[in-house]
């Protein structure tokens, strides 16, 4: 059985893609009322504006009203995934090659559960990281969560835009 987050993903992802957005994450916060938080990113590597979030929110709201997946009252929050966005799909690692990432694992690998390094490559369900002077191979299924890291290099590129 799919979680409510997976069901929401299934009904909104295609519409967001058609609008030029990647659906990054669907998450519930709070209790009464529930808050449905949806993080989006641009498919063409442009910044996500407030107007983009508003358009996406209207589309998502209409779909959720029709699909009626959420029984109780809720608030909808649509936001940019941000500079230190989560990497939740295997494909994300290829999109962000050469970027710094923090990874938390579900279990120990070489005596550690946390790694930070540059993504060298991602293939065959494996992530290759350059951590300091060594290369670390991480099985994608071991990853609990991962986020991009805002480095000085990335920050300088943003200032030039």
Curated annotation (Swiss-Prot):
CDD domains: YlxS_C (cd01734). Keywords: Cytoplasm, Ribosome biogenesis. The keyword Cytoplasm applies. It is found in: Cytoplasm. GO terms for cellular component: cytosol. One of its GO terms (biological process) is translation. The keyword Transmembrane helix does not apply. Signal peptide: none annotated. InterPro entries: Ribosome_maturation_RimP, RimP_C, RimP_C_sf, RimP_N, RimP_N_sf. Pfam families: DUF150_C, RimP_N. Belongs to the RimP family. Required for maturation of 30S ribosomal subunits. PANTHER family: RIBOSOME MATURATION FACTOR RIMP (PTHR33867:SF1). This is Ribosome maturation factor RimP. It comes from Rickettsia rickettsii (strain Sheila Smith).
């Amino acid at each position: 059985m799919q979680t409510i987050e997976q069901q929401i993903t299934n009904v909104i992802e295609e519409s967001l893609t058609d609008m030029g957005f990647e659906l990054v994450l669907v998450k519930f916060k709070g209790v009464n009322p529930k808050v449905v938080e949806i993080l989006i990113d641009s498919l063409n590597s442009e910044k996500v504006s407030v107007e983009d979030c508003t358009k996406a929110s209207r589309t998502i709201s209409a779909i959720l009203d029709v699909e009626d997946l959420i029984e109780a009252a809720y608030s909808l929050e649509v936001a940019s995934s941000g500079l230190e966005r989560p990497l939740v799909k295997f494909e994300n690692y290829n999109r962000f090659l050469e970027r710094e990432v923090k990874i938390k694992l579900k279990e120990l690998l070489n005596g550690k559960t946390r790694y930070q390094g540059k993504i060298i490559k991602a293939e065959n369900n494996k992530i290759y990281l350059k951590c300091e002077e060594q290369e670390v191979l991480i099985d994608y299924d071991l990853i609990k969560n991962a986020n991009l890291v805002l480095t000085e290099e990335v920050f300088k590129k943003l200032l030039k835009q």
